[in-house]
């Protein structure tokens, strides 16, 4: 009691504040941001990769290795070329955002509309109007995936858009699904064989009974 009475209230309050600040700092630093999926491409959009990263620097490091780039890299949005130059902006991006990685001297350019966009081998007429446009993007989020993931995006009349993402499966998941389907198929085949066997048995028994009745009538 004498020790508590000798304490200065301001010193006690400062000690409690320091302890709470230190505890909050440790809790904050011990919880790193989670890994999130992104899709990155080079400035010509010829190479596309699916990468997972928790921070902007981590994504740039993985893109440097995966896309075989060098030098200082710049990260921009593929859609409109907006620079992703801060970690705060990067954390605001949604999952599966399409990003473009630029090397020194390279610049963003819009997507070209031409033969591949319309698929008929002819350029789009000048006074035509879009009814529907479909974009297919195949990518891998993990190098161990056997099949890449597929993203399908549909835009109607240039106003309404919707997208569907089909995630790829790794070797273990593919093997598990294959075994599950094989087991189901074998079970169905077993039931079918049992049904055929029962039908044949009834047919044989019926034939034997018919033969026995025929012999009795002959006597």
Curated annotation (Swiss-Prot):
GO terms for biological process: apoptotic process; COPII-coated vesicle cargo loading; execution phase of apoptosis; intrinsic apoptotic signaling pathway in response to DNA damage; lipid droplet fusion; lipid storage; positive regulation of apoptotic process; regulation of apoptotic process. SUPFAM superfamilies: CAD & PB1 domains. Its main location: other. It is found in: Lipid droplet; Endoplasmic reticulum membrane; Golgi apparatus; Cytoplasmic vesicle, COPI-coated vesicle. The keyword Endoplasmic reticulum applies. Keywords: Apoptosis, Cytoplasmic vesicle, Endoplasmic reticulum, Golgi apparatus, Host-virus interaction, Lipid droplet, Membrane, Phosphoprotein. Residues 34-110 form the CIDE-N domain. This is Lipid transferase CIDEB. It comes from Homo sapiens. The lineage of its organism: Eukaryota, Metazoa, Chordata, Craniata, Vertebrata. The gene is CIDEB.
């Amino acid at each position: 009691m004498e020790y508590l009475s000798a304490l200065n209230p301001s010193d006690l309050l400062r000690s409690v504040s320091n302890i709470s600040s230190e505890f909050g700092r440790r809790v904050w630093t011990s919880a790193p941001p989670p890994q999130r999926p992104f899709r990155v491409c080079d400035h010509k959009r010829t190479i596309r990769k699916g990468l997972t990263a928790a921070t902007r620097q981590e994504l740039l490091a993985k893109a440097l290795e995966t896309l075989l780039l060098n030098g200082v890299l710049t990260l921009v949005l593929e859609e409109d070329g907006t620079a992703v130059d801060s970690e705060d902006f990067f954390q605001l991006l949604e999952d599966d955002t399409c990003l473009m990685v630029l090397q020194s001297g390279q610049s963003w350019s819009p997507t070209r509309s031409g033969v591949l966009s319309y698929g008929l081998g002819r350029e789009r007429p000048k006074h035509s109007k879009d009814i529907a446009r479909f974009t297919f993007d195949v990518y891998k989020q993990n190098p161990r995936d056997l099949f890449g993931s597929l993203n399908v995006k549909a835009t109607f009349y240039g106003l309404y858009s919707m997208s569907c993402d089909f995630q790829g499966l790794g070797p273990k998941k593919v093997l598990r699904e294959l075994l599950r389907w094989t087991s189901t198929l074998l079970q169905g085949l077993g039931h079918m064989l049992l049904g055929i066997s029962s039908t044949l048995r009834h047919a044989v028994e019926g034939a034997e009974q018919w033969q026995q009745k025929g012999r009795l009538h002959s006597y």
